[in-house]
UniProtKB/Swiss-Prot annotation:
Protein name: DNA replication and repair protein RecF
Source organism of the structure: Haemophilus influenzae (strain 86-028NP)
Main location: cytoplasm
Gene Ontology biological process terms, A to Z: DNA replication; DNA synthesis involved in DNA repair; double-strand break repair; SOS response
Nuclease listed as a keyword: no
Pfam families on file: SMC_N
Length: 359
């Protein structure tokens, strides 16, 4: 999977962009604030329908413009697609695939599996459980065809139940939802547990390469007592849930936990080690997708050199090259990319929102 061409209009400070990319490595060189992270953000938005920088659409659309537009040409093996996304200031999103309307963001996400590595991405490890649930759910979205529908229905039922709890409804009014909610909760949790277990040896093996000085242990917690019947828990805890106005236990509390030397990694590891572990997780997940589904991720790496010494940068560069994935990397200077000794690459300079190819 690779983006061969990208057009960007009215997105942040970027001047109208029309770029052809290398299917392997693409380097974006420029000072802070030049627009190189904005280009990564545009690529990410094309594959997710949202930004990794801001939840406020009006901050992303160029000043005094009604919308921004993204268009990409995608190649995978012998197949090619054109994808387009337009976001209006009023909030509406228009999605086209091969020129046809009526597509959803989830259709774009399926076409464009992406892994994002940024300085802010450490929330995967030191943030709340929701970041790690999202990590697992991303994998299941691409591995398990029935997951997205089940996950969407599960979230819908949880919202309905929480609304009923907030309205102080009796259990007789909620019981009918609990039957289906429990069924979906067990299914989603089983998928998460199986995916976490499949990923665990790949994570631990990659950790031995990047963090040989540490023993990293990985575990999945489903969000309620192991081996307990979730339907019974919903019944038993109804009064507590009603007092809280929300459902306390369940798959919405699941977590994918990482420990080093028996302690949570955020309490033990340095920022540099946390960044390496984040890279390990993204690499392992991308490589697992390739192994199981024969699909490559697109890797977006912002500020490649930060927090990593020369040896670790060389290790990461080598592993990315071995993955066969398309990679986009930002850096302030070309010197920061000297460990990226790759043959197939394109170099771009970014200055005040203007992007030019250097080779």
């Amino acid at each position: 999977m690779a983006i061969s061409r990208l057009l960007v209009e009215k997105f942040r400070n970027l001047t109208a962009v029309d770029l052809d990319f290398d299917p392997c490595f693409n380097f974006l060189i420029g000072n802070n604030g030049s627009g190189k992270t904005s280009l990564l953000e545009a690529i990410f938005y094309l594959g997710h329908g949202r930004s990794f920088k801001s939840a406020v659409t009006n901050r992303i659309i160029s000043y005094d413009e009604p919308h921004f537009t993204l268009f990409g040409q995608i190649q995978e093996s012998q197949h090619q697609w054109s994808v387009g996304l337009q976001k209006l200031r009023q909030g509406n999103t228009l999605v086209k695939i091969n020129g046809e309307d009526g597509n959803k963001i989830s259709d774009l996400a399926h076409l464009l599996p992406m892994q994002l590595i940024t300085p802010e991405g450490l929330t995967l490890l030191n943030g709340g459980p929701s970041y790690r649930r999202a990590f697992l759910d991303w994998g299941l979205f691409h591995h398990q065809t029935s997951f997205y529908s089940a996950w969407s229905n599960l979230n819908r039922l949880l919202k309905q139940r929480n609304a009923a709890l907030a309205q102080n409804q009796p259990y007789s009014a909620i019981k009918i939802w609990d039957v289906e909610l429990a069924k979906l909760a067990h299914q989603v949790s089983q998928w998460r547990a199986e995916y976490a277990e499949a990923l665990r040896p790949e994570i631990e093996q990659t950790c031995q390469l990047f963090l040989p000085e540490l023993e990293i242990n990985v575990s999945f917690h489903q969000g309620w007592e192991k081996n307990a019947d979730y339907y019974e828990i919903l019944q038993q805890n109804f009064e507590r849930d009603r007092a809280l106005n929300y459902t306390f236990s369940g798959p919405q509390k699941a977590d994918f936990r990482f420990k080093a030397q028996g302690l949570p990694v955020e309490d033990v590891l340095s920022r540099g080690q946390l960044k390496l572990l984040m890279c390990v997780l993204r690499l392992a997940q991308g490589e697992h997708l390739m192994k199981e589904k024969q699909r490559h991720c697109i890797f977006l790496i912002d500020d490649f050199a930060s927090e990593l010494d020369q040896y670790k940068r060389a290790l990461l560069a080598e592993r990315l090259q071995q993955s066969g994935s398309q990679v986009f990397v930002t850096a302030i200077t070309q010197r920061q990319l000297k460990e990226m000794q790759v043959e197939n690459k394109k170099m771009f300079s970014v200055h005040n929102g203007i992007i030019n190819a250097l080779n």
